[in-house]
Amino acid sequence: MASGGKKSLAQSIFQVGGNGGNALGPILAALVVQPFGQRSIGWFSIVAVIAILTMLHIGSWYKRRLLNATLHKKATPQPFIHLSRRRVHWVLAILVVLIFSKYFYLSCMTSYFTFFLIDKFHISVQASQFCLFAFLGASAIGTLGGGLLGDRFGRKYVIWASILGAAPFALMLPFASFGWTIALAVVVGLVISSAFSSIVVYATDLMPDKIGMISGVFFGLMFGLGGVGSAFFGWLADRTSVEYIFLVSSFSPLLGIVAGLLPNTQKKAVSQQ
């Protein structure tokens, strides 16, 4: 509704708020929670209340828009490309694999990067939180950049370059020195985080009459696979080591190669017009 035709950009702007909040978490933990204790977490409830009030206002606005749209209901939107039902399901399965490869790796980074740095380089907890902020901040920037590039160059290519392109940097990270580890983490965050908005918009282009369902499924997979990945790597770390789980997780972006099997929706859409 609010994208103005730039769907990937609109989706990335929506996501960058959440990613930006995640990035600020380690900084606030280092500057507020660590020196003042766990009770200081309650101070952040003020921000949550402001967010709730803002969402109530937006919800009222959206309700009016829905009522207006119902009165002026248009024909059911048609897919940008015409694929058989079986092919659509196959493409959606590929997108699920890509979501898995991305968020399985990110779950390891977001949950255990600080422990990895403390264990391998013996830095302080506070310093490790600043390093995690660098990774998450780069992820927020990458999310926004991915939306811009997806609208300009095509979502398939952004998805492909984002996940598979992060693989060499992820594979080098467990073996790097401290300085290079942080630099590689920033590059991985920038690159791998640029894919999700393009994945969601790509999926909704396949089934434009089920935007709510498709968005819900992929956002659910994002959180669900992240949680499963975090639990899995925690279990594996207890039986091996933190350094070992980073070695294992570094191979997951290689699954990005399956993005080459995706049809180029934007190119076909233009040829059909």
Predicted regions and their residues:
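Helix-loop-helix hairpin linking two adjacent transmembrane segments in secondary transporters
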Residues: 14-64
